[in-house]
Amino acid sequence: QTTTYLHPTDGKGVTHIHSLMEYAPHQLLIGSDDGLLLFNTLTEEYKLFTENETVPNSLSNRFVYPIIKDREGGIWIGTYYGGINYISPNAEQFESFSHSRLYNSINGNVIGRFCEDAHGQIWIASDDGGLNRYSPKDRKFVYYLPADHKNSLSYHNVHALCMDGDNLWIGTYTGGVNVLNLQTGTFKVYRSYTDIPTSLDGTSSYAIFKDRSDRIWVASMNGINLYNREEDNFIRIKNLDAMTIDIDQDTKGNLWFSTQGKGLFKFHPEKQIWKNYVHNNTLPNTLANNQVNCCLIDSHGEIWAGTMNGLCKYNIEEDNFETIPLEIPSHNICSIIEDQHILWLTTTKGLVRYIPGEGCQVFTKSDGLQSDQFLPNAGINASDGK
């Protein structure tokens, strides 16, 4: 006995089937003149993939001919006029968002920071597209740009984000620091003035951090500022003579400042003690490079530093750093994100899944990533696990 599926007369069929391949148990990939179908032989449900210029990474041509699966599980799809398409076995692990003029999308293509508010909304800093807000619930983007009226973002080049209750602190390049009240939707801008010592010590900020004592630390291109809540102004703490692009706090209350060119600075606010950790070719157990992109204190209290030349781990007993040997395409570690004791490292040549003491797995564009290159600190582990 034979059964016919997907007959064109049913109104949901396909014409001119060229190839069949088992994708998974009870699932077939079907190549046709209408595109690529994923068909469930038990439920008779199917999903059609076809060419669509408005959808990133869609099929290059709807006329699908040969389909094969390689030894690694990758799917190769030949088309009539669109060349070859490839689906990585890891493709469904990553979801991409990119700017489009045709449908609701993120504004900007250069993404530098993420921040999550109490309602689960993701705030996104962009170099070229201002501030974005993404709602995972309805999958919609809203963006904020400078406007002629005063109640707007001061500049479109955004680099730092930090939540403080209902206030979102926003660091910009040359536009000062903005504070957006999420309840009222109003912006307040803090700037630098040479004749006002209680103003910020610079016009640009790449890192803003709220510590466990609810203090707000604002890093400029040169130094560190502490927000004075009572006076609504700033205390200029120290000129580091370097741009700070990340801040974190360890279990002992020390603040760690990652700088571009001057290594790591450790500061204890109560004891007012500073210490600088730098790379030294003549000494063992120093930082791998003085350009430190990021710092993470993990759930075990371990301190990790991502540098331009490798991943480093702090030895608390010896008060020094060891460089972790990793077999990865690029040792320029841009950010470190922890998820269930696994470290995710973004680099300039892909995303690395690293289990300390075990090994690495590298993901690239062929695995579904939008790009192999990441900016420093452009990553977040959101409350929904993504």
Language model region names:
Residues 1-386:
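Carboxylate-rich, polar loop motifs that coordinate divalent cations or form catalytic acidic clusters
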